[in-house]
Amino acid sequence: PNGFHLNGDFQRKGYSEFTYRPFTLEGNMFSADALQEMLFQMKNGKIRLFPAIPEEWKEKGVSFQNLRGENGLMCSAKIEDGILTWKIQSEKPQKVSIEAFGKVMEGLLEAGKMLTGSQNMIKYRICKRKE
């Protein structure tokens, strides 16, 4: 979706019978949704942590708490000092796949129990040895 929305014809151009300029939340909610999608995504049991954040955020640190996923899942995660940590809790048992920065981890969530994890994000550059 592109976020375009026509609600009322306050300029009286014939687009709608409603000629008032109503207050709408689409623009505000669109930006909040985009930010959440940068931090956390979930579809069909596959969780993606920080899938679209800028490199600068990874270096400075970023976090979110208690974002809802599908099937009663609640997730919190943070990046601090090059370490990603996360906590996931579910209202019902389910298998999940957690993807972050090219690595995939799988786990079984029990109802009411917390699944936690950590991942070192520091990358090393390997160079050919000069002879």
Located regions from the model:
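Non-catalytic C-terminal accessory modules of carbohydrate-active enzymes
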Residues: 1-130
